[in-house]
Amino acid sequence: MKEYDIIIVGGGPIGLFATFYSGLRDMSALLIDAQDELGGQLVTIYPEKMVYDVGGYPGILAYDLAQNLIEQAKMFSPDIRLKEWVDWITRTQDNLWVIKTDKGNEFKAKTILLALGIGRITPSRLGAGGEIEYENRGVYYTVKRKKDFEEKRILIVGGGDSAVDWAINLAPVAKSITLIHRRDQFRAHESSVKQLYNIASVHTWHELKEVKGDGSKVTQAVIFDNRTKEEKTLDVDAVIISIGHKGDLGNVPRWGLNMKGRDILVNAKMETNLPGVYAAGDIASQEGVPKMALIAIGFSEAAIATSMAKKYIDPNVSIFGGHSSEIMKSRS
């Protein structure tokens, strides 16, 4: 069994940066993620949205940011495994960690970094008629490519920021936008809701009852007023159900980690209570420190965690390995 210096669990932006940084610190790394592509929420939930709070970018498309991070993560040739979920971790007698995946594979490492984000991401579904039948054939839970919705009659279900933002972002390319929400109050930002009413047909107190199609694509959607039960049939080409995503942590709460709710508790060094196991990003929380789910902060945590992992492996090395320009120059 190959032995790694570090196994990074989670292929979102924080896990990707940690993979790069571990390579910069001359650590052999395995990056493992449950999704079928790297990038985490950047590609799974909001690939077509702009990100403005990452240093060095006045604004960058989430998908493009993910691609840059993936390219950076691969600089030092880490091993990468996708569509594989870490089911269990075990400490060996020689103070190594063995992770076991849902596919029955086992991998050994000196240290582990948990960059799990919100966990394995799955969309929240309504359970409407025809929803599953037409999934990815007209029923969607996110927008991966705006061009796929050009000149489409689009029905959006939801009242949060994602639903309203998709309506606004797709309006310039869509043939028409209709948005339904089961209440008359929106969770989205007030200015966005005001803009929504200018670009879309909005039906409050309405829910989706059924999606209809011709067997290969969506052609209609049946909505109803949840107060009067009156139904309406809309001619549509696409239905976007934007009512949130669920994060599944699987067996993580049973690994012996100190946790608070869904968060893994760490100290200022990003160390968990398990020796050689670190956490960074949305999954990590420090007692007494305000939690800010920002990519920029996660990058810093990833650098600290990987540096502490390096120090754990070799107590004689400096925690700060030097500036990247100096490190790269020394390797050339």
Curated annotation (Swiss-Prot):
InterPro entries: FAD/NAD-bd_sf, FAD/NAD-binding_dom, Fd--NADP_Rdtase_type_2, Ferredoxin-NADP_redctase_2. It catalyses: 2 reduced [2Fe-2S]-[ferredoxin] + NADP(+) + H(+) = 2 oxidized [2Fe-2S]-[ferredoxin] + NADPH. Pfam families: Pyr_redox_2. Its cofactor is FAD. One of its GO terms (molecular function) is flavin adenine dinucleotide binding. FAD binds at D33, Q41, Y46, V86, I121, D282, S325. Keywords: FAD, Flavoprotein, NADP, Oxidoreductase. It comes from the Archaea. Binds 1 FAD per subunit. Its EC number is 1.18.1.2. PANTHER family: THIOREDOXIN REDUCTASE 1-RELATED-RELATED. Homodimer. Belongs to the ferredoxin--NADP reductase type 2 family. This is Ferredoxin--NADP reductase 2. It comes from Sulfolobus acidocaldarius (strain ATCC 33909 / DSM 639 / JCM 8929 / NBRC 15157 / NCIMB 11770). The lineage of its organism: Archaea, Thermoproteota, Thermoprotei, Sulfolobales, Sulfolobaceae.
